[in-house]
């Protein structure tokens, strides 16, 4: 694979574009067809921003990647570290410029800008700062839905998806930090500061709040859409509770997987309900 393409991790970029389309459908439902141009622009921009973020990540992790990921473009010598850094700047800048000059809704640009600033802060310090880094990852995971909602001029329905993704991701990141505690001696993670038990209780509390929040969205739907949402979100929450169960039983890897699966099913519940409105 071309090293410039590999740096962007194209799989992640494509998944981001899919999330944008999903968020737009959650917000607009069948009327999404009226916003084809805006959604296309947002997908291209989002892919560039994610690609730039991944290139920046590879630049910052270039020393550890010599051992952990020697086949990546920088440690393999396919591209220099300086070139990768410049490439990340070009992608991040271009992704923002596209939004600024092509979309009338400046709030889409604002969300993207905040996301880029959060990404840069994460890669240059917050990653090693524990809970602040967890919050940053949570924001970036949820912001794509607000971004998509703004693109179709109806962010309201995506606020719930943002909240769910934000809280569930923070919980998942804390559980991941618990799992990685032995190898994260150089990071000031929440488990390293307050211990595993307290950290796990906080992660569970945040996830329970996310589960409760998911049911507050039912007033957005009625009829078949309401039935579809309740059914889908209940399945999602069963997976979330399974994640809590596995975390309590010290199976942190499976717990993270359960939470991620629950987030995916929750998104499908919103999509299905939006299509039935």
Question: How does the language model describe each region?
Answer:
Residues 17-60, 95-99, 106-120, 155-175:
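Membrane-embedded alpha-helical segments that form the functional core of polytopic membrane enzymes
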Residues 17-23, 75-76, 135-150, 191-196, ...:
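Small-residue-rich segments of transmembrane alpha-helices in multi-pass membrane proteins
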Residues 8-15, 80-90, 132-137, 197-207, ...:
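Select subsegments of transmembrane alpha-helices in polytopic membrane proteins
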């Amino acid at each position: 694979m071309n090293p410039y393409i590999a740096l962007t991790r194209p799989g992640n970029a494509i998944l981001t574009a899919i999330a944008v389309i999903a968020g737009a459908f959650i917000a607009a439902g069948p009327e999404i067809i009226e916003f084809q141009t805006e959604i296309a622009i947002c997908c291209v921009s989002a892919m560039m921003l994610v690609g730039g973020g991944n290139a920046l990540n590879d630049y910052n992790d270039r020393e550890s990647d010599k051992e952990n990921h020697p086949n990546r473009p920088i440690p393999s010598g396919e591209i220099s570290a300086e070139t990768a850094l410049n490439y990340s700047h070009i992608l991040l800048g271009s992704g923002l410029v596209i939004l600024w000059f092509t979309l009338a809704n400046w709030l889409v640009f604002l969300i993207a800008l905040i996301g880029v600033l959060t990404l840069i802060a994460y890669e240059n310090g917050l990653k090693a700062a524990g809970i602040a880094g967890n919050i940053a990852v949570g924001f970036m995971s949820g912001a794509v839905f607000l971004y998509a909602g703004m693109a179709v001029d109806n962010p309201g329905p995506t606020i719930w998806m943002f909240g769910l993704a934000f809280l569930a991701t923070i919980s998942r990141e804390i559980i991941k930090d618990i799992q990685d505690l032995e190898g994260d001696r150089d990071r000031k993670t929440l488990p390293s500061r307050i211990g595993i038990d307290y950290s796990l209780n906080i992660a569970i509390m945040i996830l329970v709040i996310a589960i409760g929040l998911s049911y507050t969205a039912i007033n957005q739907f009625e009829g078949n859409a309401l039935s579809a949402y309740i059914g889908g979100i209940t399945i999602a929450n069963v997976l979330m509770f399974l994640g809590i169960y596995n975390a309590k039983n010290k199976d942190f890897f499976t717990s993270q997987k359960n939470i991620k699966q629950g987030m995916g099913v929750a998104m499908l519940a919103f999509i299905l309900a939006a299509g039935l409105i």
